[in-house]
Amino acid sequence: GAESLREDDFPTSRTFTALKALPPFVNLYESERRARRRAFVAYLSELAGGTPPARLVVVDVGWKGTIQDNLFALLCRDGDTPVRSITGYYVGLVAEGAAGPGNDKHGLLFSAVGERSPRFRVFNENRALFEVVLAADHGSIVSYEIDAAGHGRAIRGEFEEGEMLAAEVFPVQR
């Protein structure tokens, strides 16, 4: 039946095109998108102690700064938030993504952006090791909401790797 249908490339499929043409879907999508954006800006405000800074700094493992690019599009493009620029610091960068004015990225240990850094190949070959050794001790954020008190709040997903990380990775991190 229809419930077992799987599209190989959903974003380019006829099914997705038809879905995007349905007014109920479009209305729900836009409503949720706006609500999540408001909640995310409120969450940033909470983290900043009142108002998000004009320059936001992102620190991550790497590799292209895609999350940073999405944050830049969300917070800086329309000019309707206090955030005017984002700077990212990464263990390594293998591509610049959408870096540009106001969206700067820096590879701290290695980088392929511009001139390749010394020993780039060695570090690049071991990216999976960096991901494992620098693993977080919590589930990923899956959404944002504004709670009953009007505060922005992150909603975390299940921490599926918790047991394995606790047994194998966290002892190495300490």
Task: Mark where each language-model region is.
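Long, contiguous domain-sized segments
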Residues: 1-174
